[in-house]
């Protein structure tokens, strides 16, 4: 009997060996990412047609040592290629692996191709043609260290290509992997199966194909073994016909029901089309639904929930996933008692958010990504009901409810879309939580080194889940940021390219925010009363805004009736943002000027006069584009002296900064001919009442003679 190699994903070797035994293979040998076996051609044909988890079947022609390219060429030349296929067949060489001497797979493929062609030409036969587009034959060369395996790929394109899927949702599973997940779950044909995040429906379709005993390769039209000289067309036709009959009968006798849900209607439509092409559309019910709210279908006794939820590369950047897994775990325990769940993910931290203990787990890669499949029993006991009723982080939840009751009422009265509902009120939950219309931003302060990473992560997941429960916010609308002490050079750090801008309202003014592209959102919430005050002071006045950021103070001044405005910032991005803010509020006249400049340098040489000046400089800055460093404690008098030249006789400077323990140098200020009034308390809004030092704010005017 000839030798063969069945290739599969790492972690599925033993499962594949069991499958091959069921298909008639005797004594299979498990190897890395595959199974070796010997079998008659009838069994091989059945394996190609019926294997659900093999990606390819290789007929092994030779195994030999490969130390260098000469060994490779001689090993390939030793095979009598014309005895296997005729020269009129097209072929391609697939070369997998490298070693110390053969470092390029394309070079390795070229040497094998040369050896094949040379065997034909030396036998006075025509050269076979090489074609990378739908070749008749694929020659497979696998190199691992100094060991090589050379043979024919009997399949052609991978066996995961069943023919029913032409498009998929985001990050689709390969059909072979999906079939393995079904096999490793607790599902069998006697149980209903539900996928609450079904995407394009691959898991459910693969399970349905198993239930109706439909061969996964039955719709496949081309097989590379058909181009070999020893191809037995009559035997193959008999095996395929037998499979088709079995499939037709199987569809009619299936009792199992399958249910798929996804939030995306377009993906559900794709899943329905895939099921139709697979011939199992009558077995699967697809519908739009949220996994965190999915209800138990009627008759779903002892059912199985199987899914592949989304998983981010880093927990800290995927708060929506923390909320999703937490809420999904709660829903499973609350609604699906007596059932089992099988969840596949690359992220153990996210699986921990389910708050469920796995009965079994299997390591199984998704491509190159290490993943794990965990099976859970969902108990229906009193213990389960008690666990469901326990609040997550009750102390934190109670504080959040109290804050929302008080601050939410105030925000609605003041017509504010954006406000803070929690600001590290409790030492164990060290974060700030802000509402931005329909979104929640959780800004986690970096945990001290004395707190273990596991404990900090658990507190974070508790906070996120509790916030979702208390606020009712959609899980996709939760955004997490980690706040650390910012140096001047990264005070407005760019985080990602997501470009999600939308309008919010603040005291009748519309302002544009972006919650994800930058560490800050475009709106400093602690200054909402300061901006309101500037709007009330600005009527008929010439207004100057320095270190303007996104110009929100300018918008308030303009909407308050300012005669003119000048907005200055060093960042072109933020100046353009400021212009959009003004345009959104209909403030588009030429009396509103915007200037990109180093504010410190501009102040030293600028002229012009203003009635109202707002300046909110950084605490410290050493930006490469600034000619000098700036320290607000050290340099505030110099700053105010420069502003004095531009301040009209009855004018006002509103000076603010965020330095804790800032001290105004009253003596130096008086010497400069200015006087100051501290209005920090008056500009502290209710949502920042606990944080007395969030900012300092002063009214600066000319000293009376």
UniProtKB/Swiss-Prot annotation:
It is found in: Cytoplasm. HAMAP family: 23SrRNA_methyltr_KL. CDD domains: AdoMet_MTases (cd02440), THUMP_AdoMetMT (cd11715). Residues 43-154 form the THUMP domain. It is an enzyme of class 2 (transferase). One of its GO terms (molecular function) is 23S rRNA (guanine(2445)-N(2))-methyltransferase activity. Its EC number is 2.1.1.173, 2.1.1.264. Specifically methylates the guanine in position 2445 (m2G2445) and the guanine in position 2069 (m7G2069) of 23S rRNA. SUPFAM superfamilies: S-adenosyl-L-methionine-dependent methyltransferases (SSF53335). Keywords: Cytoplasm, Methyltransferase, RNA-binding, rRNA processing, S-adenosyl-L-methionine, Transferase. It catalyses: guanosine(2445) in 23S rRNA + S-adenosyl-L-methionine = N(2)-methylguanosine(2445) in 23S rRNA + S-adenosyl-L-homocysteine + H(+); guanosine(2069) in 23S rRNA + S-adenosyl-L-methionine = N(2)-methylguanosine(2069) in 23S rRNA + S-adenosyl-L-homocysteine + H(+). It comes from Aliivibrio fischeri (strain MJ11) (Vibrio fischeri). Pfam families: Methyltrans_SAM (PF10672), RlmL_1st (PF22020), THUMP (PF02926), UPF0020 (PF01170). GO terms for cellular component: cytoplasm. InterPro entries: 23SrRNA_methyltr_KL (IPR017244), DNA_methylase_N6_adenine_CS (IPR002052), RlmKL-like_Mtase (IPR000241), RlmKL-like_Mtase_CS (IPR053943), RlmL_1st (IPR054170), SAM-dep_methyl-trfase (IPR019614), SAM-dependent_MTases_sf (IPR029063), THUMP_dom (IPR004114). The keyword Methyltransferase applies. Gene3D superfamilies: 3.30.2130.30, RNA methyltransferase domain (HRMD) like (3.30.750.80), Vaccinia Virus protein VP39 (3.40.50.150). This is Ribosomal RNA large subunit methyltransferase K/L. Belongs to the methyltransferase superfamily. RlmKL family.
């Amino acid at each position: 009997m000839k030798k063969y190699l069945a290739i599969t994903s790492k972690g599925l070797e033993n499962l594949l060996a069991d499958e091959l035994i069921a298909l008639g293979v005797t004594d299979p040998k498990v190897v890395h990412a595959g199974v070796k076996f010997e079998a008659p051609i009838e069994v091989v044909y059945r394996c190609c047609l019926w294997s659900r988890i093999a990606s390819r079947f290789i007929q092994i022609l030779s195994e030999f040592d490969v130390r260098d390219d000469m060994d490779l060429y001689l090993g390939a030349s030793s095979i009598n290629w014309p005895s296997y296929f005729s020269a009129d067949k097209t072929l391609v060489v697939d070369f997998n692996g490298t070693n110390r001497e053969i470092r390029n797979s394309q070079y390795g493929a070229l040497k094998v191709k040369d050896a094949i062609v040379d065997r034909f030409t030396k036998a006075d036969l025509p050269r076979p043609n090489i074609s990378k587009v739908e070749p008749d034959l694929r020659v497979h060369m696998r190199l691992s260290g100094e060991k090589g395996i050379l043979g024919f790929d009997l399949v052609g394109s991978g066996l995961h290509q069943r023919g029913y899927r032409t498009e998929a949702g985001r990050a689709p599973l390969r059909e072979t992997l999906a079939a393995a997940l079904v096999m490793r779950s607790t599902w069998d044909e006697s149980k209903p199966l539900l996928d609450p995040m079904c995407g394009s429906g691959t898991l459910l379709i693969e399970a349905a194909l198993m239930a109706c005993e439909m061969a996964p390769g039955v719709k496949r039209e081309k097989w590379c073994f058909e181009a070999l000289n020893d191809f037995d067309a009559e035997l193959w036709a008999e095996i395929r016909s037998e499979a088709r009959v079995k499939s037709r009968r199987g569809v009619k006798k299936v009792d199992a029901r399958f249910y798929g849900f996804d939030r995306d209607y377009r993906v559900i439509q794709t899943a329905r089309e895939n099921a139709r092409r697979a011939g199992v559309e009558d077995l699967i019910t697809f519908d739009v639904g949220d996994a965190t709210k999915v209800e138990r279908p009627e008759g779903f006794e002892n059912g199985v929930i199987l899914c592949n939820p989304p998983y981010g590369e880093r927990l800290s950047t995927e708060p929506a996933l923390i909320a999703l897994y937490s809420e999904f775990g709660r829903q499973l325990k609350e609604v699906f008692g007596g059932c089992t769940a099988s969840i596949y993910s690359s992220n153990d931290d996210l699986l921990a958010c389910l708050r469920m203990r796995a009965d079994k787990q299997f390591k199984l890669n998704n491509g190159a990504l290490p993943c794990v499949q965990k099976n859970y029993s969902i108990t229906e006991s009193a213990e389960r009901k008690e666990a469901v009723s326990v609040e997550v982080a009750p102390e934190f939840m109670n504080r959040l409810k109290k804050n929302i009751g008080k601050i939410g009422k105030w925000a609605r009265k003041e017509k504010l879309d954006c406000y803070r509902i929690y600001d590290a009120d409790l030492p164990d939950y060290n974060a700030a939580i802000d509402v931005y219309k329909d979104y929640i931003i959780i800004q986690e302060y970096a945990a001290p080194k004395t707190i273990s990473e596991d404990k900090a992560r658990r507190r974070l997941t508790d906070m996120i889940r509790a916030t979702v429960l208390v606020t009712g916010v959609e899980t996709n609308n939760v955004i997490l940021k980690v706040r650390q002490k910012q140096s001047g050079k990264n005070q407005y750090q760019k985080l990602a390219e997501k470009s999600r801008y939308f309008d919010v309202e603040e005291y009748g003014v519309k302002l544009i925010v972006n919650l994800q592209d930058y560490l800050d959102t475009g709106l400093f919430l602690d200054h909402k009363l300061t901006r309101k005050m500037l709007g009330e002071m600005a009527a008929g006045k010439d207004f100057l805004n320095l270190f303007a950021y996104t110009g929100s103070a300018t918008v308030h001044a303009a909407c308050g009736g300012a005669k003119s405005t000048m907005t200055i910032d060093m960042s072109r991005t933020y100046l353009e943002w400021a212009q959009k803010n003004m345009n959104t509020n209909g403030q588009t006249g030429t009396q509103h000027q915007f200037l990109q400049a180093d504010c410190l340098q501009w102040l030293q040489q600028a002229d012009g006069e203003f009635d109202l000046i707002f300046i909110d400089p950084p605490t410290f800055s050493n930006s490469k584009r600034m000619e000098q460093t700036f320290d607000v404690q050290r340099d505030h008098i110099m700053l105010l002296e420069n502003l004095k030249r531009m301040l009209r006789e009855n004018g006002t400077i509103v000076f603010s900064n965020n330095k804790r323990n800032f001290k105004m140098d009253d003596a130096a200020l008086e010497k400069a001919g200015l006087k100051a009034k501290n209005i920090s308390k008056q500009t502290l809004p209710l949502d920042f009442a606990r944080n007395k030092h969030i900012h300092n704010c002063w009214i600066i005017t000319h000293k009376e003679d």
